[in-house]
Amino acid sequence: MHKFLDGAKSEILKYDVISFDIFDTLLLRPFIKPTDLFWYIETKYNIKGFHQARILAEMQSRKLSKEQDITLDEIYHQIPKEFHSYKEVEIATEKEMLVPNLEMLELYRFAKENNKRVIIVSDMYLPLEVLEDILISKGFGGYTNFYLSNHIMLTKHSKDLFKHVLKQENITHTQMLHIGDNSWADGTMPKSLGIATLFRKSVLKQLEEVFPKYKTFTPTSVAQSFILGSLCVFYKNYIQKHEKFDYWFLLGAMQAGIVAVAYCQFIYKEIHKRNIDTLVFVARDGYLLQKIFNILYPNSYKTAYVYAPRILKKAVFLEVVESESLEILRILEGEEEVKKKQITTNQQAYVYLYSNFEHCRHLALKCLDNYRRYLYSQNLEGNIAIVDTITLGYSSQGLIQKALNKEVFGCYVDLLRILNYNCVSFLPFSHPKPIYFHNWDFMEFLLTSPEYPILNVENGVPIYQKDVSSCEKYRSKAYEKIVEGAVGYASYFKESQISLGIYDVIEWVNFFIDNPSIQDQEQFKQIYFLPDATHKNALPLFCNDVSLLSCILKPSQSYGILKRSLRTNKQERLFKILSLIKKIYGKLKKK
């Protein structure tokens, strides 16, 4: 960005008159295509058919017109009567959604500061007074003249508008520099008249140069158009401006930020229907979600971040399985007491728990009482809703309900089964299998915390796992950057968020999962996830080490890793082959 700005400023100093295009140059829409604005209006106001009718009306108006350009009034003259009243809505929506291009704002101000004659030259159907109002409100005031195609009825596209500009400004072509994004209207046409040009690709093209895989992403909803369009604007105005090129920061904005914003929108709608006083974000999944919720809906609800580790719930409810017995016993007895008893394995702990069940039940009640005091210290007032991501056993909701001795409401991204709990799911429980995240562990990675795994809460303080691995330390550091990116994105677009549905988010996340770049694969080499309650058994989030050779030598182990991890296209084929072999082997074994 700075290289372009330095070169552009040098060019500006050479000329007397600096001309700027408006759309995709001075002003940016957070959509992939200009016509997606009409799609947004149709969706927001629930006016079926407006999107297509507005496009067709403009096409018909241009076909009938004998002039080089048309006005907004002429377009609405061709639209069906039921849509006539939406002309003012379209204008208001443009004003609401348009964002200044900060790179161009810097050049615009530089030109004025150096006493250049700044003019606006644009092909556009919106009325002159509307565009003048928008430009001033976005920081582009103080220009000398405004040459608008639908006002003069000459266009840049035909180059006649540029001829008109030279005449009106009383200058030669050598005195003028034009800046724009359209290769024909802002490049070829002025150049044919000898006018110098400064071509700057659209923000979408600039994003695609950095992230080539998004060239193949095709939005299937206006929300998805907004997702990619808003990220283009964010990348342009925030990331490049602040030189935030860290991979995890970008992932935070482009994945975690999108998911968190969508889920928080859902949470707000759901608890708004209910008499909720306090919103409890459960650690660790609620860490980022609380930050995003407070950005989007400040002061709307009291929020708290509360620890309710799964292993603590198992200890309190004495839900003992051998593989977790040692951790459960440490919670109940205390680590020093377990050492004194010389219990060092899960098997020993399992035997002890069942041999001393009444004693352990007493310790579990004491543990619950300690946890209750912790919750009371958080001042959780009135009716409570908890926020978590996914649940099978409702561990956090069950633990908090047990400790507070009252029902709490639960918000989840997904429910793996329905039990007798008062809750709601972002993803409908009856969802068909194909409509789902291709790798839930990636979602868990996006919605978590930089904290290490939590085992217990003592005296109001979380007790973190001590013997954390190097990969967990790496994940923690990476996630700090992810939080920065997600919070940055949510803060930037908090005023102009449109509703993002669960299926919009699923398609967006799955596109990333299914199309990992070489950079993605490289960065994820050190990222592991911990699927069990003890947080001991780490698995790679991206199966970098699974090759054809490993599939041949260790087919069962390779299958297990591939099943849980993000897969490249090559690994996807290996996984299908292993799945088929496993299926055939299973049938032969039955015989």
Name each region found by the language model.
Residues K163-I171, L177-I179, T188, S192-K591:
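Long, low-complexity, Lys/Arg-enriched
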Residues E67-I120:
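Short, acidic loop-to-helix structural element flanking the phosphoryl-transfer center
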Residues D6-A53:
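Active-site neighborhood of HAD-like aspartate-dependent phosphohydrolases
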Residues I119-V121, Y125-Q175:
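Substrate-recognition "cap/lid" segment bordering the active-site pocket of phosphatases
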Residues A53-E74:
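N-terminal accessory alpha/beta regions
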